[in-house]
């Protein structure tokens, strides 16, 4: 009797989940994984399949003569763009699609289908029909605040989002483009025109459009700090380009023209233009008073469109200015795409969507990974934000999503963001609601290539640690807490409300589970989970140390005149606790450097590593201060207040 090897749709750990899966009865012999293709098979799809299947030890694809391939691709014009049918049975896979993108997405589903049965891999016999709910599924990566991907990691990022059916990649650039005419604002390891061109071509191979995002209004301090451009600043060496200063338009004209030359004819070009709060407060005061703030803003967008429209790209802009004054929509080109960015666990995002819809503009929803300023993303917040916003975007039939990853403080890691990023990818592709529980069940197999639910549990455990550390009134702050002086009275008072033991136990559980983990796929992302857990553990231990040192020093003070042995013991332990803190920072520094170098260029790394060394140095100096206090006590049998020892006393 033939046995049923088809796996019910509920058991297929695929991200995204296909729209329709029909099980097909087949024998064990018919469950052989198809691994041969004709010479014309999509090379990007082949690269993705080979990368995944080699890592899983399934093996690479082989090229055979036409008519002999076990994976075949057929054209079916009745299917919609990006849609596909995939039939797997009898050791063969048949792909049907109306376009190359659909065929590629079918191959990406095939890549995730194999399941391990005992010691061998098998593929379920299924018929799948699938198509995206939203046309555009774009990842926006901040590459301007410190982390700046190496070319190898840019390519890995693009390959990975393509494997999970995203079709747009948008690097957010403020000053990082190395302009041939205006190189001074850029970091020495910035993105050159040749690199931008190469990334565009590479992305296109994987059916991903590279969408430049060049800030053109606010957030331009790293350009305006250069004296050559300082006269274009709204406020001295500030953040906002004054739109009525010729230097502003001349500079933007040059770099945008050069970026367009590098990327060719992108479908969109994002001009950002968000958070312009200082417009009219400086040298444009009279200009804005005369013309009106919204009119000045709209004129800037019109000017940017004039630069970009000849390329065929539609301009994109953030929506915050329009939400403040919807009348702006009457003044800007109707071809513009408005990117609707709103973060946090809001009850609904429909009012923001409705505002843009009433203006008659196409829009994309831009949820966030909630990773900024955090040791690890605020996963709970990100999932609520993405789930609600994307579901409402699908109901409103928006053009797509523009999933954002930000690095405001320059310390956060791209590799920490895959869980919320890929949830957004799944939610934008699937027509149905994507439950966090189902995504958690599917993620380890789809992303890490392992049948181990512990990976998703650990992601959520790290989110739980963050919740313990951040009360509702304090958020986006775990990086700051990591560097905060635990002996600061204000910080200590806030942290007194935190169950530090619970934080450490939860973090250490993740550390222990990830200590030896090397999944076949994306092993570095697992290492970054370990690093985050260890940093959380060190953060909580730092505040424990401060509390314990205060108690030990108070005990020393109370015994200073009548119990020399107890006093010296307390002082010695205070010193040891500072050494422990020193060692924690110095141990973490190379781990952080390893994680950084996996993904980013070295430019900003020294600045971040210096914080580890400075924190360690402070601990060394405090250890030495306790030793000096000990020596003084041996001569005088008196001790100064703790704040004096810690160099915190008023002069």
Regions found by a protein language model. Name each.
Residues 126-144, 364-373:
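N-terminal small/glycine-rich loop or linker at the start of catalytic domains
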Residues 62-63, 212, 317, 365:
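A structural preference for short, hydrophobic beta-strand core positions in alpha/beta folds
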Residues 14-30, 198-201, 207, 249-261, ...:
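Substrate-binding groove of N-acetylhexosamine-processing glycoside hydrolases
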Residues 2-11:
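Hydrophobic h-region of N-terminal signal peptides that target proteins for export
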Residues 10-136, 388, 411:
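Contiguous, structured surface segment used for ligand recognition
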Residues 100-102, 144-146, 175-178, 216-219, ...:
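Solvent-exposed loop/turn segments at secondary-structure junctions
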């Amino acid at each position: 009797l033939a046995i049923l090897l088809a796996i019910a749709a509920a058991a297929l750990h695929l991200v995204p989940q296909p729209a329709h899966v029909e099980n097909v009865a087949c024998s064990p012999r018919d469950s052989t994984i198809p691994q041969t293709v004709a010479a014309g098979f999509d090379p990007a799809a082949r690269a993705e399949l080979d990368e995944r299947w080699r890592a899983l030890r399934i093996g690479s694809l082989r090229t055979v003569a036409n008519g002999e391939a076990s994976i075949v691709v057929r054209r079916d014009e009745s299917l919609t763009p990006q849609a596909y049918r995939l039939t797997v049975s009898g050791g063969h896979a048949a792909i049907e699609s109306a376009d190359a993108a659909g065929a590629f997405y079918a191959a990406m589903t095939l890549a995730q289908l194999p399941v391990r049965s005992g010691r061998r891999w098998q593929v379920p016999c299924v018929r799948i029909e699938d198509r995206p709910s939203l046309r555009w599924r774009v990842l926006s990566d901040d590459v301007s605040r410190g982390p700046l991907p190496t070319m190898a990691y840019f390519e890995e990022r693009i390959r990975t989002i393509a494997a999970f059916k995203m079709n747009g990649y948008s690097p957010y650039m403020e000053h990082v483009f190395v302009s041939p005419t205006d190189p001074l604002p850029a970091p020495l390891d910035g993105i050159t025109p040749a690199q931008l061109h190469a990334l565009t071509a590479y992305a296109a191979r994987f059916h991903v459009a590279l969408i430049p995002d060049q800030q053109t209004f606010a957030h331009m301090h790293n350009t305006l700090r250069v004296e050559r451009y300082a006269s274009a600043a709204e406020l001295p060496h500030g953040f906002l380009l004054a739109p009525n200063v010729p230097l502003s338009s001349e500079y933007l004209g040059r770099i945008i023209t050069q970026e367009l030359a590098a990327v060719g004819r992108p479908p969109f070009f994002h001009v950002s233009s968000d958070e312009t709060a200082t417009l009219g407060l400086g040298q444009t005061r009279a200009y804005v008073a005369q013309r009106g703030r919204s009119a000045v803003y709209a004129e800037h967008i019109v000017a940017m469109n004039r630069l970009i429209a000849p390329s065929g790209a539609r301009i994109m802009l953030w929506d915050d200015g329009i939400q403040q004054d919807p009348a702006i929509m009457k003044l800007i080109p109707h071809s513009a795409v408005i990117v609707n960015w709103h973060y946090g666990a809001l009850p609904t995002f429909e009012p923001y969507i409705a505002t843009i819809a009433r203006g008659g503009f196409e829009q994309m929803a831009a949820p966030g990974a909630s990773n900024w300023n955090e040791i690890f993303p605020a996963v709970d917040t990100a999932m609520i934000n993405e789930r609600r916003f994307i579901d409402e975007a699908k109901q409103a039939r928006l053009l797509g999503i523009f999933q954002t990853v930000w690095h405001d403080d320059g310390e956060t890691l791209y590799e920490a963001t895959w869980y919320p990023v890929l949830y957004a990818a799944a939610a934008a592709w699937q027509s149905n609601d994507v439950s966090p529980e189902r995504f958690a069940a599917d993620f380890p197999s789809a992303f890490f290539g392992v049948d181990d639910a512990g990976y998703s549990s650990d992601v959520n455990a790290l989110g739980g640690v963050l919740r313990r550390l951040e009360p509702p009134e304090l958020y986006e702050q775990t990086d700051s807490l990591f560097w905060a002086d635990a002996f600061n009275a204000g910080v200590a008072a806030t942290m007194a409300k935190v169950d530090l033991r619970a934080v450490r136990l939860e973090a250490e559980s993740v550390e222990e589970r990830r200590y030896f983990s090397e999944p076949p796929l994306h092993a570095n992302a697992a290492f970054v989970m370990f690093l985050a857990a260890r940093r959380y553990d060190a953060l909580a231990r730092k505040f424990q140390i401060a509390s314990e040192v205060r108690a030990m020093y108070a005990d020393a003070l109370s015994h200073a005149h009548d119990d020399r042995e107890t006093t010296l013991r307390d002082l010695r332990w205070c010193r040891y606790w500072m050494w422990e803190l020193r060692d924690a920072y110095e141990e973490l520094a190379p781990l952080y450097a390893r994680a950084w170098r996996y993904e980013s260029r070295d430019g900003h790394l020294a600045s971040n590593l210096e914080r580890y060394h400075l924190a360690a140095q402070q601990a060394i100096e405090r250890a030495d201060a306790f030793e000096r206090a000990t020596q003084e006590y041996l001569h005088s049998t008196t001790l100064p207040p703790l704040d004096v020892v810690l160099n915190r006393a008023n002069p």
